[in-house]
Amino acid sequence: MQVRLSPAVARAVLGVSPAELDGAVVALDDLWGREASRIREQLGDASSWEDRFALTDALLARRREAGSPVDPEVAWAWDRIVVSRGLVRVDELAAELGWSRKRLWSRFRSQIGLPPKRAVKLVRFDHAAHRLVAGQDAARVAADSGYADQSHLHRDVVAFTGVTPATVAGEPFLAVDDIAWTSQEAPAKTHASGVLRR
């Protein structure tokens, strides 16, 4: 099962700030200890995918409730980035919050795990990648997604994935996940493929 967490809830669910992980791949056992083993057993004992999804959804909701939420301003900034599909400027976010760019960068980085400018690029890339998978023309995707031109889109695709846009367009996991970042308040959505999004 794959679970994709919004960065706005990742700290609460994981029990550690994404900034502390610094992009490292960490085993769930290292984060949750024995609880990870119990979850693995429960998922293995479940008789259907629906039961596995229900178990996972309940676990995520419980951990989110018990965990430390991000600051409301940081959650608002993340949601604004997502709603704009990565087309908002960081200085606009800071101005709307009444914060300096430095304050926004510091709080956002410490709670979300990446600087706001990188988050903007990531969300813009994600939106563009999903449009490529949907079969849209790369030049049109680049223009509509706020890239200066197709070569800038190509550069971001290679930087984020290590492969070309044509390769990304054929990635099957993107075809079942219409968007990566839902609003932090949205309920989990499950798919028959075994992908659970929150």
Protein language model regions, located:
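Long, low-complexity intrinsically disordered regions
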Residues: 91, 105-110, 114-120
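A periodicity- and composition-biased signal for non-globular, repetitive helical segments
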Residues: 127-130, 156
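Alpha-helical bundle regulatory/interaction domains
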Residues: 1-101, 114-115, 130-133, 138-148, ...
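A secondary-structure capping/hinge motif
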Residues: 108-114, 156-166
